[in-house]
Swiss-Prot record:
Regions that span the bilayer: 286-306
InterPro entries assigned: Cyt-f_TM, Cyt_f, Cyt_f_lg_dom, Cyt_f_lg_dom_sf, Rudment_hybrid_motif
Keywords: Chloroplast, Electron transport, Heme, Iron, Membrane, Metal-binding, Photosynthesis, Plastid, Signal, Thylakoid, Transmembrane, Transmembrane helix, Transport
Organism: Chloranthus spicatus (Chulantree)
Pfam family, one: Apocytochr_F_N
Keyword Transmembrane helix tagged: yes
Official protein name in the record: Cytochrome f
Topology versus the membrane: Single-pass membrane protein
Cofactor note: Binds 1 heme group covalently.
PANTHER family per UniProt: CYTOCHROME F (PTHR33288:SF10), PTHR33288
Lineage, highest ranks first: Eukaryota, Viridiplantae, Streptophyta, Embryophyta, Tracheophyta
Location within or outside the cell: Plastid, Chloroplast thylakoid membrane
Co-factor requirement: heme
Amino acid sequence: MQNRNTFSWVKEQMTRSISVSIIIYVITRTSISNAYPIFAQQGYENPREATGRIVCANCHLANKPVDIEVPQAVLPDTVFEAVVKIPYDMQLKQVLANGKKGALNVGALLILPEGFELAPPDRISPEMKEKMGNLSFQSYRPTKRNILVIGPVPGQKYSEIVFPILSPDPATKKDVHFLKYPIYVGGNRGRGQIYPDGSKSNNTVYNARTAGIVSRIVRKEKGGYEITIADASDGHQVVDIIPSGPELLVSEGESIKLDQPLTSNPNVGGFGQGGAEIVLQDPLRVQGLLFFLASIILAQIFLVLKKKQFEKVQLSEMNF
C-alpha cells in the first residue's frame, strides 16, 4: 500500500514538472520571438558610433532613404511630434524566416538630445494619440531615456512613425540649456541580412566558399539546398548549406569561382539614417522678440500717421 502511494506521488510530481517545463518553454520562446529588436540593444552601449554611423547598419546592409520632421523650435516642457518617414514600395514582398514571402516590417531608432524624452501618456493630446496608432515605444537603455526604439511593426500601416516627445525645462534640469540641438534617426524596412551573432539570415546572398566544380545539389526536405563543390586545387569536397528563401543560381557540373554568388539576393529592404536640428527656445526671448516686432509695427503706424498729418498741413498752407 505504501509503495502504491509512493508511486502515485512520484507520478504526480513528474506530471507537474513536465507541465511547468512546457509553460516555461512557451513563455521563453514567445519572449525571444517577440524581442529580436532587443538583440541590437544588448550588443552596443551607444547605438551611434564615433563616426556618426548608427549600428543598425551592421545587420541591415542595403542603403535606403529615411527622413525626419521636427519643429524648428520648441518651448520648455512642451510635447511635440517627431515624424520619422520610412518610404518603400508597398507592393514589395520580403523573404520571411520560414522562406515564404510576406509583407515588410519597419523599425526606427531616434536619438534625441540629452534631456528630451518620450512624453508621458497623460501629456499626449488625443489628436497625437490618433496619429501614433497602437505603437509601443521603449528606451534604448533605462539610463538613456533620450534614445527611443520601435519595431518591428507592419510597414503598410506605419511607414510614417509619430514619436511624442517631451522637451526639457532648463529651470529644473541644470544641464540643459537654450541652444540648437541635433537629432539623429535611423530607419529600416524589411529583415536584416546579418544576425547580431554574425551569422547570415536567409534574406541575403550566399557565395561559394571555394572555387571548383558543383558536384552535387540536394534539395532539403524542409526547404533550402545542400551544395557540394569539388575543390579545384585538390578535389576535396566543400559543402555549402543554403537556407530556404534565396533562389539558386548554379547547377550540377558548373564550374564556379571563389565567392561567386550561389543564390540571388532576395533582400528588398534596407536601412537609412538622417538627422535634423531643433532649437530649445527661451520663452523670455520669444516675448522680447514679440515686443520688438510690436514696437516696429507701432513705429510704422505712427510714421504713416505723422506723414499724413504733415501732408494735410502742407496742403492747407498751399491753399492759404
